Amino acid sequence: MCESRSWLYFTVLVVFVAQAAVAADVVPTEVDMPGTQPGEVGNLESPSRCDNCHAGYNNESTAVAGQGAPQDEPFTGWQGGPMANAGRDPIFWATLAIAEQDFDGAGDLCLRCHSQGGWYGGRSTPTDGSGLATSDSDGVDCDGCHLMTNSDNSEHVGVMVSPFIANCVADPLLPDKSCDSAGEGFYGNGMLSLWGGSEKMGPYADADARHPFLQSRFNRNVDFCGSCHDVSNPVVGDLAPNNGKQHKAPHVVSSQDYYNGVANLGGPREEKAAFNNPPYAYGIVERTFSEYKASALPTTRVSAFQTLPEDLRVVGGSLEVTYQAALAAGTEGDYADGEERFFSCQSCHMRPVTSAGANKNGLQIRPDLARHDHAGGNYWLVDMIQYQQAHSLLRFGEGVTDSHLAQLAAGRARAVEHLRQAASLVVDSDFLKIINLTGHKLITGYPEGRRMWLNIKWRGPGGALLREDGAYGPLFNENGEPVLVENPAGGPDVQVESILEPDSPNVRIYEAHYAITSEWAATLIASGKSPDLARSYDRPDDEVTMSLGEMASQPA
């Protein structure tokens, strides 16, 4: 087997602890970030208002007639997708709890995207999410996108009040700071610039909306999606000795620049990294958007699909399916209004369909309505929500409706479909070639919860199984005893399932490997963090294999 493997280097999401971990009522300046702030826009509406018009009008008859299926309705597709359910994600809530233990107030960063309505409505403090309303579980809601303006102020100008300006206009350029140009917006971390008027925004010039409306070209811009899908840790960005940046990356301006290289915990926000640098520059956590921007796809028109390398033109692969969906609009791959369509985030994750956008009489059937399902690969989210709903374990107790559950099931199927489109495998003699058919790294996004591996079964004469590499199944400890965890719904403990022999030389696992420097570990200890804090564990017995103190003693 021949394999090309690239390692991803991340700064561990570990931050200063100044006191016992309790939810913060005031967001620390290290966690504060630019963009529209809570309470600054008063025109936010519940998604239930959008449901009145943007769902419930497509049916079997319209689908047969080629005029749209129920899943093509904006609200219906959204309701079954990951964005609508970001505030219900149990992994999010578990991660939020851990972040709050590490740094009091860190949860504000998480809630900014996972509960947009709650954050902009001023309910994100206490920062453990205990102040949120039940309706805030809708996650990334309609107004979060349809009030978003470009933070570089190149089109409609959203609400941003100094010092919360999410662009480089007031910042010196390289080499003094990491901005490339004075017009560069801060795209990442949910630092949105929201429109303060009553209009909803969308990409069409001819929308016959029954509410105030403005055309926004930003809705088709890839920076629109980048506004959330580069995630950086602003605390690491400001306080860590290397600011959590890539090796040899440009200098990151932080509070350390004001105090002779010493971080100023709790200092003015104007000194902090998040207020002086684009988010891709510091505190690396997730880089889906940056991965995409580093590829050739942002400048490749969908109509140029046939010029792509043969390996990428796999029938049924992500790029080919996107190409076919765009062709159906009848404009050789471009938008129906003549605008050039590139292999953008929207082209792949909001593929065009033929449907009306609302239930009002006389609305045109558009050949390139963007499907609002935002499908990715996270099908397991639906499994968890369904389980918690069935056992009354959802974070917000009122649960979800039967209709919502049906949309979740449909969303799960779309996520599985996207996973199948993401890669192709080519076997040539004793070589296996893995081809990435996505616009970013093949595993991307949340690095603590994503991995990919090869499950290879070697068979002999008659199909007899000779060996299996990368097998997945129930775990046992070194004594042959089942590895069990507590059943959250009560009843018998549950045996853990995972990759059975992850350290075997024949097993290929692709995942992010975290790392911190010894200087960062020493800085954490100097700030009051216990040197006994576990940094790594044995699997599956949970024995500590390295502490923070041991990490700090490693050579620089």
Could you say what each language-model-derived stretch is?
Residues 50-53, 110-113, 142, 225, ...:
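Short cysteine-rich clusters marking metal-coordination/redox-active sites
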Residues 24-64:
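N-terminal module-boundary/linker segments of secreted carbohydrate-active enzymes
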Residues 1-10:
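Bacterial N-terminal signal peptides that target proteins for export
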Residues 97-103:
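Membrane helical hairpin/interfacial module
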Residues 9-19:
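Bacterial N-terminal signal peptides
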Residues 107, 112-124:
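Conserved, well-structured interaction surfaces
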Residues 43-48, 103, 107, 137-139, ...:
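Residues immediately within or flanking Cys/His clusters that coordinate Zn2+
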Residues 25-33, 60-95, 127-556:
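Primarily the internal scaffold of c-type cytochrome electron-transfer domains
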